[in-house]
């Protein structure tokens, strides 16, 4: 793609947008960087690009921002029904999403992972499997390292493992992974995608350009994910925790097996997998399937599963103070993710929850408390909504506390906990009402726990 001298507008100046600006500048494009937020809000983000020859625009979108523009590249956070998108379409200006734009530069094959929950763990785990073969691998995408950086660095013989979100899949055109994977699909981001059916179909776009010599790996146990198989024009490879499969990855006699064309091979005994929980078994099956189909040996897969310790902010053990364990699950940004965290812990739980309202319902989340959650400490925009749902299912009002800050929530949680309990931050909500992102929320939680020792 020749961009020298072309006028390119980057919409959205988060992590991806900043990366796009840097790469476009290096490709000698004339870059316009736009965000609806004002400069003062974005000042910190813009530090690394402020010295580049970029034309910055902030605040409410104006049609003249697109005057003479050849290409608009959208960051994932910019909705497809926004004014900038509608205007670009009216003016017939080429419009590419960040992932689509990056894909067009890629020399290396991309192994793409999506799903509502488990994406980051599965992507990281798969990246480790590639790394442990001695291959040069880039782990990128929604995981925090922009895909555009990875494709610019990766050579033809390298590999890219990418976590891909529904926001990124909305705008693909030619994007075609070597192997794709959908771990699961449960309601999320309905404030953006409007209906669950829309959300499901956008997730299914991950394999829409793959053909018969390529694979998509799908969760056989999840009816919503498995229903997408009929749309696939490529080979479908299932994984299951519950059923024996003639062709796919499955559990038999306490071990993971993978069978391709009827030839089954044992990978590992489940008890040898380092990261705990049923949801992590699902992640292990998904990552192992993609690795095996890409030619990675059973030995390398097994050794990685024995040593991989999980990812930051996902049921991350933080500390134990006076017999009370603290876990950071700030990555629990929807009810289903937080249900999995509650299920993974075997002790009584003091739960810190609440945050930005994405339009989720919390009925299943509250039902999962199941006698395990002894105190509920609520923060953020959804605090009252979760409280009302908890009361609907007769959760004791005396066991529900509110906190104005996460630091206050941690203090209240510690005061409420006894030796043998776990304090779990698993908000079941996004972080944007109080924090820049879930990483910041997780770091503040860990700092607040450390303060308890002072």
UniProtKB/Swiss-Prot annotation:
Q: Which domain of life is it from?
A: Bacteria
The alphabetized UniProt keywords are: ATP-binding, Cell cycle, Cell division, Cell shape, Cell wall biogenesis/degradation, Cytoplasm, Ligase, Nucleotide-binding, Peptidoglycan synthesis
One Pfam family hit: Mur_ligase_M
User: SUPFAM superfamilies attached here?
Assistant: MurCD N-terminal domain (SSF51984), MurD-like peptide ligases, catalytic domain (SSF53623), MurD-like peptide ligases, peptide-binding domain (SSF53244)
The EC number(s) this enzyme carries: 6.3.2.9
Family annotation (Gene3D superfamilies): Mur ligase, C-terminal domain, Mur-like, catalytic domain, NAD(P)-binding Rossmann-like Domain
Which class of enzymes does this protein belong to?
Answer: ligase
What GO CC annotations are associated with the protein? Answer: cytoplasm
> What GO MF annotations does this protein's record show?
ATP binding; UDP-N-acetylmuramoylalanine-D-glutamate ligase activity
Q: What is its main location?
A: cytoplasm
- Which positions are annotated as binding ATP? 115-121
A Gene Ontology biological process in which this protein takes part is:
cell division
Would the keyword Cell cycle turn up in this protein's UniProt record? yes
Instruction: Identify the pathway.
Output: Cell wall biogenesis; peptidoglycan biosynthesis
* Similarity comment: family membership: Belongs to the MurCDEF family.
Q: What is this protein called?
A: UDP-N-acetylmuramoylalanine--D-glutamate ligase
């Amino acid at each position: 793609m020749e961009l020298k001298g072309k006028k390119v507008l980057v919409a959205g100046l988060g992590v991806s947008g900043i990366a796009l600006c840097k790469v476009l500048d290096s490709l000698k494009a004339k870059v316009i960087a736009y965000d609806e937020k004002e400069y003062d809000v974005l000042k910190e983000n813009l530090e690394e690009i402020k010295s580049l020859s970029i034309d910055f625009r902030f605040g409410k979108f104006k049609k003249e921002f697109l005057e003479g523009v050849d290409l608009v590249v959208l960051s994932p956070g910019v909705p497809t029904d926004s004014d900038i998108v509608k205007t670009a379409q009216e003016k017939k200006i080429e419009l590419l999403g960040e992932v689509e734009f990056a894909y067009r530069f890629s020399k290396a094959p991309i192994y793409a992972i999506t799903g509502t929950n488990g994406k980051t763990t599965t992507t990281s785990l798969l990246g480790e499997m590639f790394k442990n073969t001695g291959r040069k691998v880039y782990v990128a995408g929604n995981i925090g390292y922009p895909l555009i950086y990875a494709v610019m660095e990766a050579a033809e013989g390298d590999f890219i493992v990418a976590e891909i979100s529904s926001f990124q899949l909305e705008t693909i055109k030619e994007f075609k992974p070597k192997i794709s994977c959908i771990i699961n699909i449960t309601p999320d981001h309905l404030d953006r995608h409007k209906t669950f059916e829309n959300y499901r179909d956008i997730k299914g776009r991950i394999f829409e350009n793959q053909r018969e010599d390529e694979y998509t790996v799908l969760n056989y146990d999840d009816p919503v994910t498995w229903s997408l198989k009929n749309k696939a024009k490529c080979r479908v490879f299932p994984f299951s925790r519950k059923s024996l499969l003639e062709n796919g990855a499955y559990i038999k006699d306490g071990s993971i097996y993978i069978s391709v064309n009827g030839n089954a091979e044992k990978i590992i005994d489940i008890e040898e997998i380092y990261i705990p929980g049923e949801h992590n078994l699902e992640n292990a099956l998904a990552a192992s399937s993609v690795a095996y189909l890409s030619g990675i040996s059973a030995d390398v897969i097994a050794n990685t599963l024995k040593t991989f310790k999980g990812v930051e902010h996902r049921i991350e053990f933080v500390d134990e103070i006076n017999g009370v364990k603290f876990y950071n699950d700030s990555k629990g940004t929807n009810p289903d993710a937080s249900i999995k965290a509650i299920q993974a812990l075997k002790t009584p739980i003091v739960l810190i929850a609440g945050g930005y309202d994405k339009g989720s319902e919390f009925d299943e989340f509250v039902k999962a408390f199941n006698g395990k959650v002894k105190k509920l400490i609520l923060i953020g925009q959804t605090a009252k909504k979760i409280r009302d749902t908890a009361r609907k299912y007769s959760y004791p009002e005396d066991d529900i506390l509110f906190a104005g800050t996460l630091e206050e929530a941690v203090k209240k949680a510690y005061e409420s906990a006894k030796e043998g309990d776990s304090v779990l931050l698993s908000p079941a909500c996004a972080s944007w009402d109080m924090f820049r992102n879930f990483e910041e929320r997780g770091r503040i939680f860990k700092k607040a726990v450390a303060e308890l020792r002072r």
